[in-house]
Amino acid sequence: MAPQAPDREKALELALAQIEKSHGKGSVMRLGDEVRAPISVIPTGSIALDVALGIGGLPRGRVIEIYGPESSGKTTVALHAVANAQAAGGIAAFIDAEHALDPDYAKKLGVDTDSLLVSQPDTGEQALEIADMLIRSGALDILVIDSVAALVPRAEIEGEMGDSHVGLQARLMSQALRKITGALSNSGTTAIFINQLREKIGVMFGSPETTTGGKALKFYASVRMDVRRIETLKDGTDAVGNRTRVKIVKNKVSPPFKQAEFDILYGKGISKEGSLIDMGVEHGFIRKSGSWFTYEGEQLGQGKENARKFLLENGDVANEIEKKIKEKLNIGAVVTADDVLPAPVDF
């Protein structure tokens, strides 16, 4: 027979007191004890993607996975997040396992390359050990690992070319994520893992595509983004950029499976102004009549390219449109380096 209610409450209070004595105050708490503020975020640089994420950007204190085919815009999205974190006064680190980071391109996207911490590790173990130490310092706001596929275990590097190393990388990723997830939550650091696609052999039904590094990252990631290039943007006959679609495949902080489309211009990155025009038209703030775009009676230009240039030259108008869109959709928490909210980690 179950003990009476008062006895159960007393037993629970004793247990909680014992836990606090052993493990410190706050080891166990009731979820309703504290008023939870909105999860603070790092904007992605595209308002369409911020809206698709549901909270106005990438959540702090979480693991994010960005994957997709080659040259789809994965690193560009990550670098824009780095630039936005730095603009808010944050500290960023980039672990360049592929040894392919272009500082000039990063600078064009708004990244402060002088203060960006960069590591080009020799092995996967070294890369993840550096990541763990940086996260545990508590000083980092955003960390990018580019890419999971390039995190080669030491045994594979030191072995012969034809040797079999089944599951080594998956075990390495699983161990690393077990270690860093709690530290991310405590420090409020956002960790972005960029990943590549592979094809499973012999798949008859469903998609044969899969990501590298085993299944651990799929479980630990709070947000997974599938980035695809869907169209080439042209100025006459010259290719000037790509139309990109991002699908939020997994989202623990908002409803998943939303999609966002935006332009990535060669040498310039995500077109914030182009994204504002798309969202402004969709939500009725910008009026499109034929090829003309109008905002509150003021003509932005004929054709999207001219409207984009107008917003680029008139930042106050662009900021006003962005503010109205965010207010209508009720997204976007204030982000400052001094006011980081540790996000709870759920598995």
Curated annotation (Swiss-Prot):
Any one GO biological process: DNA repair
UniProt keyword terms in alphabetical order: ATP-binding, Cytoplasm, DNA damage, DNA recombination, DNA repair, DNA-binding, Nucleotide-binding, SOS response
GO cellular component: cytosol
Gene Ontology molecular-function annotations: ATP binding; ATP hydrolysis activity; ATP-dependent DNA damage sensor activity; damaged DNA binding; single-stranded DNA binding
Ligand binding (ATP): 68-75
Cellular localisation: Cytoplasm
PANTHER family: MITOCHONDRIAL DNA REPAIR PROTEIN RECA HOMOLOG-RELATED, RECA
Family classification: Belongs to the RecA family.
NCBIfam families: tigrfam_recA
Record function comment: Can catalyze the hydrolysis of ATP in the presence of single-stranded DNA, the ATP-dependent uptake of single-stranded DNA by duplex DNA, and the ATP-dependent hybridization of homologous single-stranded DNAs. It interacts with LexA causing its activation and leading to its autocatalytic cleavage.
The protein, known as: Protein RecA
Gene: recA
